């Protein structure tokens, strides 16, 4: 049996552009894609912290160092410049491998600079 697990995430990215008249996708700074391990055209989930919207699209590579997070096409209705979002990619692994797997976690500041990276999400009590 294959289990679907969090492969990686960009945590609290700031949307820099929202382009409705675009073919689709989410353009992400190439350095951020590399840090997280997200490939161009890979399916991603975006969770908008500002409004609770959750949607699926695919990643495209923006210029490295640009700090761009551009939500494009129909998804532009779900995110505005300045919104903080969590961008996740998932993968499937056999149960035996899943038990040993750790995701790549990339934490960003409000300017889409990497603050820290990790592989475990700490438990947060309410």
Curated annotation (Swiss-Prot):
One of its GO terms (molecular function) is aspartate 1-decarboxylase activity. Binds 1 pyruvoyl group covalently per subunit. The active site is at 25 (schiff-base intermediate with substrate), 58 (proton donor). Is synthesized initially as an inactive proenzyme, which is activated by self-cleavage at a specific serine bond to produce a beta-subunit with a hydroxyl group at its C-terminus and an alpha-subunit with a pyruvoyl group at its N-terminus. CDD domains: Asp_decarbox. It is an enzyme of class 4 (lyase). Its cofactor is pyruvate. This is Aspartate 1-decarboxylase. The gene is panD.
